[in-house]
């Protein structure tokens, strides 16, 4: 039987429209179908209705297929965007504080078709030990893995036996456990959507299963059993910060970023995991993967069409080399199509193995920023030949610090001028308010107020609208006294190194520790040591049962240097690292 394209599309459209579009499922997409549209699809867009069209497939010059998506009218800023030309600039912003820090977080969907970023904040994750938690999760292929990580990461971290004594090991263990949970049948997805009750049989609970491939739309009742599918091409990065006393511990998987400001100088506490980074590329190629980039057509300012190189991607699909989930390519969680069970987690094309760095809060520590790649990474802007979108380079870590400083200082100057106008010039220049004239002094006075952080964080996110990506940031400001240590925890002396290792390793891996610039990473009994990324000016050592290499690189893909392990660690140091007498 032959079904004509117009008839086929009409049947699909009728099927989709027949489903009610007003049932409440918490603001998420209600369904998707296929329809054929003649002419300009924007003519079929109702900005005030429940439906919008998403380009899907063009068969010829007449029949163009679009996915017809049901969405709630009163959707939040985290809902689906209608078009790349209709940015969602509304933001979800929060703030809070305890006796050591104050924070503001902001997230904006921007020009993306959907919001796939998520974040989590726990100011008092462990009140007895003065522990605060902040995390940014940048999803790809969908938002569900990022949402699950935001819901579970800090909870699982608190459950770790090593949480009180070894944060580095605890973070690494949580990444492995999260990846394992994503393979569990339906459990993790069910926790995201508790309204999907297996006992419900009402017809109003029928909904569509949205497939990210866009190939079809399945209709099922929530009371029916649905076979579980691994999030093959869905995953999330994770950049988590744990502040305990005067110590900052950062765990990073993927291309989100954490940057610390000291006296106005940016200090990277994470490294972007990109496929073209030499160490990442080496791991990918070793297990049979490929890394390449493609050219995209674009219009320049003169209206001429030109080609621009896109980002390096694994298998031409994934632009981050570490994340959660996956089996062929891996990211912090998900991407099971990129993972191979033959290899250990450290050696996957896309691995969930985190980099851990530790820094101390000192008197000149001002604030830190955790941001998704919508703020800090290079973005490809031109996808529409009918409209000119200039290519936007990334904000460097120093750019981010300078931006925050500028906004906070302008607020101080306004407050100072206001005091002067009120005849209180003397108060403006007291010891606590000299910040009005010196941008390098930590902005810790209560004069600034939470509104300043709130506004600054929102402006930082809004500044990255041109990246055509979701933008999420957490701005954490340190209060006076934040540099004071808490009583030493059991088995950890002040100034001692923590040991970071994999969750499945009975003997801890060599420390993956950085006191701002020095890192030591490696494994025991591992034939191929996987080294963390190397930052400019840092010294890293990879240790194993046999020999280790140190690789240094630059963004241009520079040469490698070797370091003899004996020159870095003597017998006494090795005994200390392995816990031997």
Curated annotation (Swiss-Prot):
Binding-site positions, Mn(2+) 2: 138, 373, 469
Names of the cofactor(s): Mg(2+); Mn(2+)
EC number: 3.1.3.16
Residue ranges of the region described as Disordered: 538-563
Reaction(s) the record says it catalyses: O-phospho-L-seryl-[protein] + H2O = L-seryl-[protein] + phosphate; O-phospho-L-threonyl-[protein] + H2O = L-threonyl-[protein] + phosphate
Source species, domain of life: Eukaryota
Record GO biological process: signal transduction
Family matches, as Pfam families: PP2C
UniProt-listed Gene3D superfamilies: PPM-type phosphatase domain (3.60.40.10)
Keyword Chaperone attributed: no
Binding, Mn(2+) 1: 138-139
Entry keywords, A to Z: Hydrolase, Magnesium, Manganese, Metal-binding, Protein phosphatase, Signal
Residues spanning the signal sequence: 1-21
MF GO annotations: metal ion binding; protein serine/threonine phosphatase activity
Cofactor note: Binds 2 magnesium or manganese ions per subunit.
Boundaries of every PPM-type phosphatase domain copy: 102-478
Family affiliation: Belongs to the PP2C family.
Name used for this protein in its record: Putative protein phosphatase 2C 22
Species of origin: Oryza sativa subsp. japonica
């Amino acid at each position: 039987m032959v079904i004509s394209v117009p008839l086929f599309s009409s049947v699909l459209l009728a099927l989709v429209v027949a489903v009610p579009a007003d049932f409440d499922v918490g603001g998420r997409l209600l369904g998707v179908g296929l329809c054929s549209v003649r002419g300009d699809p924007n003519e079929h867009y109702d900005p005030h209705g429940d439906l919008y069209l998403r380009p899907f497939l063009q068969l010829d010059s007449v029949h163009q297929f679009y996915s017809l998506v049901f969405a709630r009218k009163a959707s939040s800023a985290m809902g689906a965007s209608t078009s790349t030309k209709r940015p969602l600039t509304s933001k979800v912003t929060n703030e809070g504080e305890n006796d050591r820090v104050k924070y503001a977080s902001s997230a904006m969907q921007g020009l993306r078709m959907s919001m796939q970023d998520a974040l989590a904040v726990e100011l008092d994750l462990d009140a007895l030990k003065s522990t605060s938690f902040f995390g940014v999760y940048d999803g790809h292929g969908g938002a569900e893995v990022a949402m699950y990580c935001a819901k579970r990461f800090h909870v699982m971290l608190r459950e770790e036996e090593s949480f009180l004594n070894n944060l580095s090991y605890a973070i690494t263990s949580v990444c492995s456990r999260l990846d394992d949970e994503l393979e569990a049948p339906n459990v993790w997805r069910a926790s995201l959507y508790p309204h999907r009750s297996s006992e419900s049989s009402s017809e109003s609970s029928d909904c569509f299963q949205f497939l990210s491939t866009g190939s079809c739309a399945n209709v099922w009742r929530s009371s029916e059993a649905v076979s579980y599918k691994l999030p093959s091409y869905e995953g999330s990065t994770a950049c988590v910060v744990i502040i305990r006393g005067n110590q900052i511990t950062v765990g990073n998987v993927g291309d989100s970023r954490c940057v610390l400001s000291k006296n106005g100088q940016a200090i990277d506490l994470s490294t972007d995991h990109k496929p073209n980074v030499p160490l990442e590329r080496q791991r990918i190629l070793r297990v049979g993967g490929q890394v390449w980039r493609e050219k995209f057509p674009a219009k320049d300012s003169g209206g001429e069409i030109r080609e621009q190189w896109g980002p390096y991607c694994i298998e031409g699909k994934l632009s981050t080399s570490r994340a959660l989930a996956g089996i062929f390519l891996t990211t912090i969680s998900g991407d099971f199509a990129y993972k191979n069970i033959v290899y250990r987690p450290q050696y996957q094309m896309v691995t969930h193995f985190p980099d851990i760095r530790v820094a101390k809060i000192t008197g000149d520590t001002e604030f830190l920023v955790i941001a998704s790649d919508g703020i800090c990474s290079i973005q490809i802007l031109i996808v529409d030949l009918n409209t000119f979108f200039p290519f936007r380079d990334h904000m460097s870590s120093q750019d981010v610090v300078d931006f925050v400083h500028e906004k906070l200082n302008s607020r101080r100057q306004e407050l100072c001028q206001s005091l002067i106008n009120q005849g209180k010039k003397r108060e403006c220049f007291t010891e606590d308010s000299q910040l009005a004239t010196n941008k390098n002094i930590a902005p810790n006075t209560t004069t600034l107020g939470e509104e300043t952080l709130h506004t600054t964080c929102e402006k930082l996110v809004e500044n990255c609208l041109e990246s055509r990506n979701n933008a999420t940031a957490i701005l954490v400001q340190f209060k006076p006294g934040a540099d004071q240590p808490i009583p030493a925890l059991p088995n950890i002396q002040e100034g001692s190194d923590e040991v970071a290792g994999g969750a499945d390793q009975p003997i801890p891996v060599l420390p993956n520790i950085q006191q701002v610039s020095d890192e030591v990473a490696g494994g025991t009994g591992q034939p191929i040591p996987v080294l963390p990324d190397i930052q400019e000016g840092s010294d890293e050592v990879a240790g194993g049962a046999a020999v280790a290499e140190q690789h240094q690189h630059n963004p241009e893909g520079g040469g490698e240097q070797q370091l003899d392990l004996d020159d870095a660690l003597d017998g006494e140091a090795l005994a200390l690292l392995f816990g031997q007498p």
